[in-house]
Structures are given as C-alpha cells and as structure tokens.
Regions:
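NTP/phosphate- and nucleic-acid-binding module
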Residues: 1-172
Length: 172
C-alpha cells in the first residue's frame, strides 16, 4: 500500500509489479546455489502478491544474486521502462554474516533479510521526477514555494506580514 500511496502522490498511474526470479541454469554462477531456498522464497513472494490482490508478472533471470525480489516497473515520460521501487528477499547474506535468531522451539535459525527501497535511490527518484514532470514540478514539491520581493522599502512591513501568514499556512 505504501507504494501505491507514493505513486498516487507523484502522479504515477502506470506501473507493473514484477516478481523477479532466478534462472535455474545459472545457480552457482549468477545466483546463490540454494535451489530449495529459491523455490520457497519465490513462492512466498508469489503468495503475498496474490493474497494482496496485486496484479503482477513473473520474469526469470531478473533476481538479485542473493534472492528474488518484487520490482515496480514504470515507464518514463519518454517511454523507457525501469525499476523505480523494489523489495528484495535476501537469504544469502544473513548466512554469510552468521546471523541467527532463536525460534519458538528454542532452536537457532538463519533469518531472511528484506531490502526495501519504496522510492528507489534518491538519485534515480530525482532523475525520474525531473523527466516525469518535465521540470514543471507541482508547487508542493518545490523546496521554495514562494519568494516575496518587496519593490520598495515601504513594502517590507507588508511583505513580512505576508511571510508570517504564508509560513503559518505551511508554505515554504
């Protein structure tokens, strides 16, 4: 839901949720060689998306080396498709770092790690927004929404009054 709220906020109305899976023939080469973990974690993501009623596509050979992921694919203003947001299931790194927890049966287990980037990286998001809005950003997104420029010294007191009212109204 957080993804949908962000997309609505930024006016992104066309996107595709993608279950990015491994390519079985590349286990041990491009992907961590854990076939059972791949099967389980890809199934977990599929179940979550299905139960949430989220339409999605599945693409093989798009996973991270350490696990499957949900990528949110969007098209830029010039029609280029790219991943804006992602949630990645990492079953490899916790084991490599020796991370464990104690389960309800008092047994040590290796956790799954989730990597989340609901709005991508800062750089990718800013690049997308510049292209998406063609530089014509909505007022709420501008770091400076209003600039008061008194044209004579006698207008300064009134400009200060306006400034106070605008700040009180939440304008920047």
């Amino acid at each position: 839901d957080i993804y949908r709220r962000y997309f609505e906020l930024f006016g992104i109305d066309e996107y595709v949720m993608r279950l990015s899976k491994h390519a079985p023939e590349d286990l041990g080469k491009k992907y961590v060689n854990e076939p059972e973990l791949w099967r389980r974690t890809e199934g977990m993501i599929r179940d979550v998306l299905t139960k949430a009623g989220v339409p999605f596509v599945e693409e093989e050979d798009e996973a991270a080396f350490y696990g499957p992921k949900i990528d949110v694919q969007i098209k830029s203003a010039i029609g280029r498709e790219f991943s804006l947001a992602t949630i990645q299931v990492d079953f490899a790194q916790p084991a490599r770092f020796g991370l464990t927890y104690v389960d309800e049966h008092n047994e040590r287990r290796t956790p799954l790690c989730l990597h989340r980037a609901p709005l991508s990286t800062h750089e990718r998001l800013i690049g997308f927004l510049i292209e998406h809005f063609a530089g014509d950003f909505p007022v709420w997104l501008a770091p400076e929404q209003v600039r008061l420029v008194p044209i004579a010294d006698r207008h300064v007191p009134y400009a200060r009054q306006l400034q106070e009212r605008m700040l009180a109204a939440g304008l920047r």
